[in-house]
Amino acid sequence: MAFSQAALSALPLSDRTFRKKPSSSSSSSPNFVLRVRAAAKEVHFNRDGSVTKKLQAGADMVAKLLGVTLGPKGRNVVLQNKYGPPRIVNDGETVLKEIELEDPLENVGVKLVRQAGAKTNDLAGDGSTTSIILAHGLITEGIKVISAGTNPIQVARGIEKTTKALVLELKSMSREIEDHELAHVAAVSAGNDYEVGNMISNAFQQVGRTGVVTIEKGKYLVNNLEIVEGMQFNRGYLSPYFVTDRRKREAEFHDCKLLLVDKKITNPKDMFKILDSAVKEEFPVLIVAEDIEQDALAPVIRNKLKGNLKVAAIKAPAFGERKSHCLDDLAIFTGATVIRDEMGLSLEKAGKEVLGTAKRVLVTKDSTLIVTNGFTQKAVDERVSQIKNLIENTEENFQKKILNERVARLSGGIAIIQVGALTQVELKDKQLKVEDALNATKSAIEEGIVVGGGCALLRLATKVDRIKETLDNTEQKIGAEIFKKALSYPIRLIAKNADTNGNIVIEKVLSNKNTMYGYNAAKNQYEDLMLAGIIDPTKVVRCCLEHASSVAQTFLTSDCVVVEIKEIKPRPIINPPLPTSSPATSSMFPDRKLPRFPQIMPRTRSHFPRK
């Protein structure tokens, strides 16, 4: 039976079947059937509460897994690595990325709660575990009241209004961080590692609070702090023939000129005029270009090896638009002019007036350092002011990071923390700790600090009763009460990981009217946490409140879930095995005997007649 085009198009896509006509070469073979199925979805309604239970199971799994890492006595999590050794981490954000459940509904619950930790980590750089625990508390307490018949929309509005009020209360509790407290913030975030805390504190004292502090893989077994003066970027020499010190494998020049070209150099004759001036006046030249072809680079290397020319060449830092910005910054820093076709400047006609000046240039295999004597300081200050205005008007965190790095390079202050370890597994764990500590310190500089150890959230819980009086109805007040209970979840879990009863800890902390008084889980004692250095960045706590609240509202007001149906891959049809036959019979004609051919023997000397 043949289908017409109209009849075929009327069929649903998931039911269409196409039958391939037999070809002349395969007339005896059966018809090949091709079934085309659309990607179907499965809809789950929460009529009996089963959907909510599945979603909550996913949220419980995330909170339970990340909860073991919370606090100074939190445990590690071992993550399987498909292509290498397992990773041992104590970082909530890293663990969060690895969670993927088989059940589609539970996995939706995982992904919903994951947003709280991921967003907090993106904005504040730390606090992902606390966000997850707080969101889990809101969801757990919220499901209890909604199951009893409370309107989830009004409960969500109560949570939202309470969040805004608590953020205002948090800001009133916050204060600006002092220089000696930077080490405490970093150490607490790194799991009470004061070696890391002191190193980060020293880094910010060296380059200033607005300076750039970066993390790199170290060459030694211990951590090391390196302060770079001048402008440095990750671009090394284009050829090892440019080195001036063979033992150190680096090229170093003093009173050096810089040629900046925002394009690819393909013809060596284009550089003749400038390089001829360098030979006659005997000054070294650093060529910074988008790229240099080998044909153009070869004559430069030959003249360098003959001793006629002191020169080195590197690629311009970054790519695309960022490359152009970096070249402009370098031009202002050294007093050079960038050669661009759009500006009407030709490399072939350019003279030494376009060259910049550096007091010292150091080029290694992977990096370049440029130091000036400060003769362009006024132009540099104006450029820094322009970039800072861009930072204020930029909302994207990645762009802010790039702009801050440009400010630091122009200001001449970069601190590099080199992380060392015995093994690769230990190195990755230490890098994550240092990164969390650095991000927490930056957040503390930005918005101030509050008392740590989960006590700031617990103190906020005492403000909820006053906030409830401003809410519209009883159901919104229930939402505020849910928040009040959830605010005790983090400190309860910190105490549990320290083998202490959380209820007793909460009772003792709240019995003291001093807002700085709290539980120090590292020492298992109660004291003034601010004096003890147990402090949290205000920005981290604020992001935890806002993002946990947002996820909980979405979770509690969801009543239907749409998931993809897991496609079952069909097994390939295997032809039935042919009947076994003896070597002397044919598989197609088992009764017919095949002729036996004489065995061909290898030819030896005995087969040849003697002469």
Curated annotation (Swiss-Prot):
Q: Name one GO biological process term.
A: protein folding
Task: Give a GO cellular-component term.
Answer: chloroplast stroma
Q: What else is known?
A: CPN60B1, CPN60B2 or CPN60B3 cannot complement the function of CPN60B4. Assisted protein folding requires ATP hydrolysis, but not K(+) ions.
Query: Mind telling me which InterPro entries this protein's record contains?
Result: Cpn60/GroEL (IPR001844), Cpn60/GroEL/TCP-1 (IPR002423), GroEL-like_apical_dom_sf (IPR027409), GROEL-like_equatorial_sf (IPR027413), TCP-1-like_intermed_sf (IPR027410)
Expression triggers: Up-regulated by light.
Which species expresses this protein natively?
Arabidopsis thaliana
The domain comment in this protein's record states:
The C-terminus (568-611) is required for efficient NDHH folding, but not for the formation of the chaperonin complex.
Q: What happens when the gene is disrupted?
A: No visible phenotype besides impaired NDH activity.
Keywords of the record: ATP-binding, Chaperone, Chloroplast, Coiled coil, Nucleotide-binding, Plastid, Transit peptide
Query: From the UniProt record, which GO molecular function terms apply?
Result: ATP binding; ATP-dependent protein folding chaperone
As for subcellular location, the record says: Plastid, Chloroplast stroma
Q: Relate the protein's function as given in its record.
A: Involved specifically in the folding of NDHH, a subunit of the chloroplast NADH dehydrogenase-like complex (NDH).
Q: How does it assemble?
A: Part of the Cpn60 complex composed of 7 alpha and 7 beta subunits. Can also form a complex composed of 14 beta subunits only. Both complexes show ATPase activity. The Cpn60 complex interacts with the Cpn10 complex. Interacts with NDHH.
Protein name in the entry: Chaperonin 60 subunit beta 4, chloroplastic
Query: Chief location of this protein?
Result: plastid
Q: Where are the disulfide bridges? A: none
* Residue segments, region Disordered: 574-595
Could you point out where the transit peptide sits in the sequence? 1-37
Q: Which family does it belong to?
A: Belongs to the chaperonin (HSP60) family.
Q: Which residues form a coiled coil?
A: 377-480
